[in-house]
Amino acid sequence: MGTWAARTQAAALHATLPRMDDNRPGAQGPQADPAAPDPAPDLALEAFTALCQRLAGFDDRLHPEWVDGYLTATAASWRTITLDELLEPMTGDAYSRTFADPADDAQARAVLEARMAALRQALDPESLLDDLDALRLQPWMAVWDDAARRELVEAGHVTEQEAATFHTGQEWAAGFLQATVDFAADWPDPPEARSGDPEGGLYADLLGTVAALAWDPASEEFRAFALAGWKNADPTRDEVIDEACFAVQELRLWWIDHPPKRPPRRVEAAPGRNDPCWCGSGRKFKKCHGVAA
């Protein structure tokens, strides 16, 4: 079994729905919000998990963790990215092959829309501003610990060396970063970053905090990241994940203060009243399409 397929299979065995433990400091589960639109968040996440596992039958990259990271990036953008916009870049032809039946397609879309709505609610700017210290984002992540890795190795799915590369949140971050590539126009380098403005540095740091989840904890780049954030101690995996989730929340707020500039709309100059009408009638504009003007 390939590494991607092994990740997909193992994710179903070692996932938490959601990963965030509601009694940890700062964590806020779906049931803590009385305005939550979904009365059964666990069932909604189970449906999302089952949907992604079907997608993974055609593209083993599309396991729930990766897809959830991808959807999270679209929810954290400065504008609303619709399901119709993101399906093809996210899934290629896997979605159309998996859900070819119209009824199946409608049900799958409802499941994805529900997950997207939950992510948008978690990243609602007003709610974030109400309590900047609250960890609202609840990512779908497979928990990789020594027992989970050992189980994969003993089942013969991967080697010990391959299992050692599996880390909680890694594929979620990979999905998030892929969405920023696929929707590069919605994740542009801000002018502040190009000009050396400190605000641009903050944007880069926030994205870097998410990217750090995808790095090998033994790598030099991760060690440099950990040293910058945790001066005298090695961070736990939970601490790194929490920082990434807070970074996503801050990115959502960053876009509120720094929306990309839209290109100016070009308005064609109207012909003069005595000019020939643009419709080709041969009459003057004032006696043709310019009458109303």
Language-model regions, residue ranges each:
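Acidic/negatively charged segments and metal-coordination signatures
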Residues: 2-293
